[in-house]
Amino acid sequence: MTFTTQVWALLGLSSALAHAASYRTVGSSGCAAQMVFVPPYTDTVVFLDNYHRNFGGPGVNLQTGAHSPHPFMQDDDSGLFVFGVEYEWRTNNLRKLTPKSNTFCAAGAFMPDGTMVNVAGAELYSGDANTKHLQDGRQTVRRYAPGPCEIDGCTMDFDVNVDELQSRRWYPTSITMTNGDVLVVGGSDVGLLVTNEASINNPTYEFIKADGSKAPPQRNLTILEFGAEDNQNADMSFNLYPILQLIPNAEGADHIFTLAGNRANVYNYGTDEVYKDLPDIPGGPRTFPGSAAAALLPLGIGGYEPTILVCGGSSGDIPNPKALPDCYRIRPNDENPIWEEDDALPNGGQTMIEPVQLPDGTIVMMNGAHKGCAGGYQAENPAMQALIYDPYKPKGQRFTKSATSEVPRMYHSVAILLPTGEVLVAGSNPDVFYNPVGKVTLANKKYPLFGNNGHTSYLHQQQSPQSAYPTEYRVEIYSPPYMDHAASRPFITAYPVSVKYNEKFQIAAQGAREDVVVRLSYSGFHTHGIDMGARMVQLEAVLSPDGDDMIDVTSPFNPTIMPPGVYMLWVIEKGIPSEAVWMKLEL
């Protein structure tokens, strides 16, 4: 166990923080932020988009959202527009990245050393922008190493292997396994569609090995399978971006909660078998384009019993899915698990919600729309108000309405937790490609019809012809209510940079004197309202008899609680979190 003194993470930022429960616009994202992750040991996030024209560089009007008059291009002679950006959230500086292959609707998870593994994507679409120097992304693996990396002179970028995946995948899901391998599940082998179809469905899963060795052959996954007769059965075909969560268990097994359409189970991906069948979730499909918010509720000490929360999304009504207001919880480790109805969303039906786990144990839900479903111009009535869900409160009191944004965050928007305890919010691009206006196309007189896999979709566009949701480049910061007490927050002054499982260690934190909680968090990979692998874990912790602001802490007892990786470590006193520091959890 290596011990370090915290000298770099605060840098006086607290004095500049906004008042509680507020949004503020801070910068431009550099590309339409369809995907986002936080590289460990850095003050940055990485934004990714699919490839198309881009006017999101310097010159974006942060008040009106008007785009830059200048195209944002790569600095080489490739003629490519920028579609990957490292965004420094303390200074709002941009650094161009080169993903090299089409990242459209990709997935991602971290290796144990903090390397992001960004997988899959789409074929090339030459109609929108020059793709001469771009590669097909469907079987691609892109690795992005952890920091630190100085913005000035930094050369960190994606290491790209175009044919590493065993099959083509568009809209898969990835999470980290107990041994540090990355699991890749599902998808379609053709892009530019909204609903999956049996002829292009990819009902399999595969691994990317943490040690670099050759992965075993991909395996079939029954929960993703359906025939042509079910192409218009939303409970079956709404199965893209399946919801996955690693479930704590004493055996250390890779038991993973899996939800696809309305079907759910706990699957052992290590032994390739169903561990436990679960009942179908009520109300219809909850995965893309149903796109519900799903979260593993914060894990507490004393057994780490898991509860999965699923809120909102869209129904399977054809041709116009309805945004759903309901929330359900399930405890998959129960002997006979059932879906229990929870408090409903207070502002009515909402789809494409981003659920972000906060260090105080609450979950903020934001973005999306109150009408329609995910996918292109499929939605209307943007959800502008953030909601805070408190799992510790009694049923009937769990939701609180929070701050309201002035920026619509529709399809292809994101939100992610920063080490400051605030939430970065970006993106929105219903057109999918670059569109400075954001209106549905009426010239071909086909509205509300649109194409899907070479033919007319059985769904309708639900965005009104009068509405406009252009490609959005503005970046906001959402300040949760606890930031009103930022001046009195704890301050981590010393901590171990790495620990092993079930290891006792100490943290020094100024201002942590009573009602102290210590948590580890994983922000995951965020896209399309799905937060791949995100989790918040409370650690056993007591104030040390040694004094001097010391806290005695015990790490998780096995990697089903938190897989090996680099995580944000928080100290919370009376509900007020410190800024986070980075700590590695090792096998």
Question: What feature does the model see in each segment?
Answer:
Residues 409-489, 568-572, 577, 581:
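Blade-level signature of beta-propeller repeat domains, shared across WD40, Kelch, NHL, RCC1
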Residues 32-37, 49, 73, 82, ...:
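Beta-propeller and closely related beta-sheet repeat lectin domains
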Residues 79-90, 131-152, 197-213, 263-268, ...:
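Beta-propeller blade signature
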Residues 19-25, 37-99, 119-150, 226-373:
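Beta-propeller domains
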Residues 19-25, 90-100, 144-166, 185, ...:
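Blade-edge beta-strand/turn elements of extracellular beta-propeller
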Residues 47-60, 82-88, 503-582:
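Immunoglobulin-like IPT/TIG beta-sandwich domains and homologous Ig-like subdomains
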Residues 25-33, 483-516, 581-587:
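Beta-strand/beta-sandwich contexts
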